[in-house]
Amino acid sequence: MRNKVLVIEDHRDLYPLFDCILQFHDFQVTVVSDGTKAMELLKDGTPFDAITLDLHLPGTPGTEIYEMLEKRGDANKVLVISAYLDEIKDLEIRGVNALQKPVLSVDLLVDRVREIAEQKVPVLR
């Protein structure tokens, strides 16, 4: 069974790329480019094995989405992707799984998402 990944990314050049890369590596991908839509999807009970999350989104900020997932105990299912090195360093110090944009290694992205997804506890509440 294919792992389900939610890609929350508003950059028009990146979300199709993430979608294509992850589908090529046999993930079932849902892409949302707005934080408010992402929150609705996460609250409606749709299960995901992994989530990639941009912090700077239109609508609900990615930080708020992350905090909601953290309160539910689902932060371990998130790979935060940010263009801001200071944010990445701060997140990594706190133990958050994070990558800096641009993601220069397809293998690193796929490996991180696979590692998260294979924990086999889908995000569902």
Q: What are the residue ranges of the model-derived segments?
A:
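Conserved acidic carboxylate
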Residues: E9
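Acidic catalytic/metal-coordinating carboxylates
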Residues: D34, P61-E64
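Short amphipathic alpha-helix used as the core "switch/output" element in two-component signaling
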Residues: T63-A75
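Acidic, metal-coordinating helix/loop segments flanking the phosphotransfer/catalytic sites
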Residues: V31-A50
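Two-component/phosphorelay signaling modules centered on CheY-like receiver
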Residues: R12-T30
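The feature encodes the CheY-like receiver
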Residues: P58
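Hydrophobic/aromatic residues positioned on beta-strands within the core alpha/beta folds
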Residues: I81-S82, K101
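Active-site residues of response regulator receiver
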Residues: D54
